[in-house]
Amino acid sequence: MADQDVDLDSIIDRLLEVRGSRPGKQVQLLESEIRYLCTKAREIFISQPILLELEAPIKICGDIHGQYYDLLRLFEYGGFPPEANYLFLGDYVDRGKQSLETICLLLAYKIKYPENFFVLRGNHECASINRIYGFYDECKRRYNIKLWKTFTDCFNCLPIAAIIDEKIFTMHGGLSPDLNSMEQIRRVMRPTDIPDCGLLCDLLWSDPDKDITGWSENDRGVSFTFGPDVVSRFLQKHDMDLICRAHQVVEDGYEFFSKRQLVTLFSAPNYCGEFDNAGAMMSVDESLLCSFQILKPAEKKQKYVYGAMSSGRPITPPRKQKK
């Protein structure tokens, strides 16, 4: 389908039409429209840097994981684009029931507002992961496997990290023992898969751990964990104020670490119907003051109504509770 045959505004309108409907109502776009979203967004990702340099004011969101109606709630809170600038930190697909609507709306907004709307790559924007955790099955059930491969081509071109006003460093996972200079990120060529180890892997997979010093192995079996000393040294070396990342369920939707030098954001409330966590979005104003907007979890009793539909897939382990 040629670009001029695709009505982007109509795609966005249909994706937003289900606002106010019962959560779970699907939007079935044409396959040709989804292909357009993937190929056009991929062109834009490639034309922009792999390490984005962004300006405040901006709103930052963590994992969404196919919880489409919660994504719509985030926009209701923060303002639908272009009312506010947005940066999403990855993990749009898998685990939730509506990965397709979620990723399609995000790609549509990227195409419509390329300089105001930004999406980073999470560890689930990777074929070997989303083949297993739900996105492949959703594509196969609702469309076909070829379309899943088209998404893979798009995901392989997503940017990896962003710096806001030279002071806030953002990525999906965390720091890497291999990261000495920002130039190393800029040198990564796209399209690329996520390797099993090294800089790119760590930026999407690593986790902070308050109980360690330096670097340690990660319970996920991938990448590392890093202590507060690593965070402090990194910020001092690069003259930055804050690391903002996602990748872990946190009870309040956001959680500080290392004397407020790092914050974890998670934007999928009642994650998978199996947690009672809130979701959060971080607003960064022009003076780089950070505030949080919270999506409260549903009442506990609802959890058992909706949670009965568990997919049986293993869940991202929650952060260790404070002793």
Swiss-Prot record:
Entry annotated with the keyword Ribonucleoprotein: no
Any GO BP: protein localization to kinetochore
GO CC entries: cell septum; cellular bud neck septin collar; cytoplasm; incipient cellular bud site; kinetochore; mating projection base; mRNA cleavage and polyadenylation specificity factor complex; nucleolus
GO molecular function: metal ion binding; protein serine/threonine phosphatase activity
Native organism: Emericella nidulans (strain FGSC A4 / ATCC 38163 / CBS 112.46 / NRRL 194 / M139)
Gene assigned in the entry: bimG
Residue numbers binding Mn(2+) 2: D91, N123, H172, H247
Family note: Belongs to the PPP phosphatase family. PP-1 subfamily.
Keyword entries, A-Z: Cell cycle, Cell division, Hydrolase, Manganese, Metal-binding, Mitosis, Protein phosphatase
Presence of keyword Metal-binding: yes
One Pfam family cited in the UniProt record for this chain: STPPase_N
InterPro entries the record matches: Calcineurin-like_PHP_ApaH, Metallo-depent_PP-like, PP1_catalytic_subunit, Ser/Thr-sp_prot-phosphatase, STPPase_N
Residues involved in Mn(2+) 1 binding: D63, H65, D91
Active-site residue list: H124 (proton donor)
Needed cofactors: Mn(2+)
PANTHER family: SERINE/THREONINE PROTEIN PHOSPHATASE, SERINE_THREONINE-PROTEIN PHOSPHATASE
Entry EC no(s): 3.1.3.16
UniProt xrefs under SMART domains: PP2Ac
The record's free-text note on cofactor binding: Binds 2 manganese ions per subunit.
Function text: Plays an important role in the control of mitosis by reversing the action of the nimA kinase.
TM segment ranges: none
Catalytic activity reported: O-phospho-L-seryl-[protein] + H2O = L-seryl-[protein] + phosphate; O-phospho-L-threonyl-[protein] + H2O = L-threonyl-[protein] + phosphate
Domain of life: Eukaryota
Protein name as catalogued: Serine/threonine-protein phosphatase PP1
